[in-house]
């Protein structure tokens, strides 16, 4: 029995359009027994070209049939794509060096985690002055603090075993001070506000969960997509813990159909939504530290193991197109196009696919001819940067195969070696909301080059799906085809059992589906993390101010007189309830604006742009932005719907500047 025939009757429960429900576990077990060794696939990096394969008597690519039949065949898409990848690797003449993942020693994993979380000065030679870390720790939630404490204790025990003479402060003492200060707050306001903010979303979440649970009783075409807001004001791990403690959480089986996935949305925040790219580098660094701690805390609360991996450095190409690290590729691209954030070859391949139209049936699914793909690769390597490559000779399916090949042949995965296991573990989280929250944090943690390229890929995939009526590529089909290109490479040279491979197929396809469907939400920085950054900055300012006062006192400087003069100057310059907006690059460089309840950032921009003349008049909305600078934030680009009075109350010491975004 061939693998194609054996898999024909296997359907992922998550994608089954009918009311006949089977458990995922039983499906996996059955598939594991029936699968043959041809499904095995272990190598991560290899020179691969897509190739045609022998198909069933009823060609899987002839899909001008009902939508239900398309969904039932989606699992077949996964195995066909996997077979294409395997055959292309067998046909390739060159073998790229496999990325080796280092197995960490005892305590090494936790030590590396603390470094990544910005807490390296809690141990080692710098442990003598942990003040910066103490400020950082004082801003953490209880679940975040527990995650840090757990890992510090492991490192501490390991170092004692190795007789290392490092002084490691007991973070329980630090957190005891933190808890004491919170407990003495009048009325326990922090705990109450946390639960209040969470409870206002809880009813909506439960309602959405009920809709998901009842979906099987209603035909898919009549099922309304449940809508629920994502709570970005409260720590995700805190939400999970509170739901766990109150036993209100309804654990739902993963479902992949668009008809059953909740239609998550971001509630409007009067102080503005913060997206990746809106913050200054120094604040974004703090965001990444907090995102790692929050992700770990979420996995800890839900009992999911989170292990970071580290790739051993291997020799890679530093020029060319394929098998080149993203950073090296961007460096050579930026010499041609300054400010380039996405590889030129990646953009050109997407552009070539779209030039021929996205309505082509089987787009992304049907592979290009293996020999032709191999020849195109060699020709691209030789002529792309010279500008002499003939793009007219590239067929649409060939361009799609080259795009997938580019992703597979990256020396390290697009989802990064460090976090690919965490991406895979997303499938183990109990609810879709928690899976979405984890993916949000993981996207934040990706290196800039990986994150930007992933964003371009997901946006392209969505455009393909938008033409599903003609190209027969639903979100499930696209997820099934793309999942092995992003995830199966993560075996990193290790073989896996057939049953494990099937489980991974189901899980990674579901995760790919979530990445595509919720991509607009995933590039948002949660408000609770931004608030923690603000708190850290405030505490650091206080510390710096105390140090400055001591310095001024030693210098016998007339501090009081200076402060009075400075205060009187500021008070006279900006009346109460008015902000002064600076626009150094516009013809009107400054304007005093009265704050009102309804004044938005877009209104401020409109006032400036309406008064422009000459060359500056050509500026359009979207070319310049209003920034919040200083106070309790480094720098933040404001979205149009930010209510200025609310933000002013949150950060009264900020300056307001209109400028363009840096490249």
Curated annotation (Swiss-Prot):
Cross-referenced Pfam families: RhoGAP, Ubiquitin_RHG40_C
Record's subcellular location: Cytoplasm
Keywords noted in UniProt: Cytoplasm, GTPase activation, Phosphoprotein
InterPro entries membership: Rho_GTPase_activation_prot, RhoGAP_dom
Phosphothreonine modifications at: 158
Record's keyword annotation contains Cytoplasm: yes
Region ranges (Disordered): 15-37, 179-227, 243-277
UniProt site positions, description: Arginine finger: 365
Function text: Rho GTPase activating protein that suppresses F-actin polymerization by inhibiting Rho. Rho GTPase activating proteins act by converting Rho-type GTPases to an inactive GDP-bound state. Plays a key role in tissue tension and 3D tissue shape by regulating cortical actomyosin network formation. Acts downstream of YAP1 and inhibits actin polymerization, which in turn reduces nuclear localization of YAP1. Regulates cell shape, spreading, and migration.
Name recorded for this polypeptide: Rho GTPase-activating protein 18
Organism: Homo sapiens (Human)
Lineage per the UniProt record: Eukaryota, Metazoa, Chordata, Craniata, Vertebrata
């Amino acid at each position: 029995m061939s693998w194609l025939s054996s898999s024909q009757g296997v359907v992922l429960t998550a994608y089954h359009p009918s009311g006949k429900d089977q458990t995922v576990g039983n499906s996996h077990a059955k598939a594991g027994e029936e699968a043959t060794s041809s499904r095995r696939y272990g190598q991560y990096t290899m020179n691969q070209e897509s190739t045609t394969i022998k198909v069933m008597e009823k060609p899987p690519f002839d899909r001008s049939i009902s939508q239900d039949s398309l969904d039932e065949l989606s699992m077949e898409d996964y195995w066909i794509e996997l077979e294409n990848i395997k055959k292309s690797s067998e046909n390739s003449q060159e073998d790229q060096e496999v990325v080796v993942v280092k197995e960490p020693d005892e305590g090494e994993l936790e030590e590396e985690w603390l470094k990544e979380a910005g807490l390296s000065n809690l141990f080692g030679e710098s442990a003598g002055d942990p003040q910066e870390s103490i400020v950082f720790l004082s801003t953490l939630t209880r679940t975040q603090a527990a995650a840090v404490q757990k890992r510090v204790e492991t490192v501490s025990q390991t170092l004692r075993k190795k007789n290392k003479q490092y002084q490691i402060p007991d973070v329980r003492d630090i957190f005891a001070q933190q808890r004491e200060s919170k407990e003495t707050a009048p009325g326990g306001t922090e705990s109450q506000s946390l639960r209040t903010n969470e409870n206002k979303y809880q009813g909506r979440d439960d309602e959405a969960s009920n809709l998901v649970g009842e979906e099987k009783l209603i035909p898919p075409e009549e099922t309304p997509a449940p809508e629920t807001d994502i709570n970005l004001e409260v720590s995700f791990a805190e939400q999970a813990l509170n739901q766990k403690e109150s036993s209100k959480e309804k654990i739902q089986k993963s479902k992949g159909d668009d008809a059953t996935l909740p239609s998550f949305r971001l509630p409007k925040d009067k102080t503005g939504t913060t997206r990746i790219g809106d913050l200054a580098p120094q604040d974004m660094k703090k965001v990444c530290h907090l995102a790692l701690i929050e992700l770990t805390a979420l996995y800890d609360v839900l009992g999911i193991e989170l292990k970071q991996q580290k790739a051993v450095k291997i020799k890679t190409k530093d020029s060319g197109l394929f098998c080149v690290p993203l950073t090296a590729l961007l460096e050579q691209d930026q010499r041609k196009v300054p400010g380039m954030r996405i590889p030129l070859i990646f953009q050109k391949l997407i552009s070539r696919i779209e030039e021929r139209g996205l309505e082509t049936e089987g787009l992304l699914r049907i592979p290009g001819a293996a020999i032709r793909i191999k020849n195109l690769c060699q020709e691209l390597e030789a002529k792309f940067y010279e500008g002499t490559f003939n793009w007219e000779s590239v067929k649409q399916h060939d361009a799609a195969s080259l795009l997938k090949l580019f992703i597979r042949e990256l020396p390290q995965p697009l989802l990064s070696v460090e976090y690919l296991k965490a991406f895979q573990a997303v499938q183990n989280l109990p609810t879709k909301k928690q899976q979405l929250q984890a993916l949000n944090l993981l996207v934040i943690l990706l290196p800039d080059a990986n994150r930007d390229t992933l964003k371009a890929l997901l946006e392209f995939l969505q455009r393909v799906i938008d033409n599903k009526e003609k190209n027969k590529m639903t979100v499930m089909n696209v997820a099934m085809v793309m999942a092995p290109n992003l995830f199966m490479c993560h075996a990193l040279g290790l073989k896996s059992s057939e049953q494990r491979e099937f489980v991974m197929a189901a899980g990674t396809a579901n995760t790919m589906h979530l990445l595509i469907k919720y991509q607009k939400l995933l590039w948002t920085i949660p408000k609770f993390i931004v608030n923690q950054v603000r708190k850290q900055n405030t505490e650091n300012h206080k510390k710096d101010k105390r140090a400055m006062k001591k310095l001024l006192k030693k210098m016998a400087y007339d501090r009081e007189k200076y402060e009075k003069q400075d205060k009187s100057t500021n008070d006279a310059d900006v009346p109460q309830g008015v902000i002064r907006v600076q626009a150094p690059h516009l013809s009107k460089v400054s304007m005093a604006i009265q704050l009102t309840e309804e004044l938005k950032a877009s209104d401020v921009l409109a006032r400036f742009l309406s008064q422009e003349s000459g060359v500056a008049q050509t500026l359009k909305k979207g070319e310049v932005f209003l920034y919040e600078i200083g106070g309790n934030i480094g720098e933040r680009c404001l979205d149009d719907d930010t209510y200025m009075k609310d933000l002013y109350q949150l950060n009264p010491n900020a300056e307001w500047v209109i400028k363009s975004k840096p490249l």
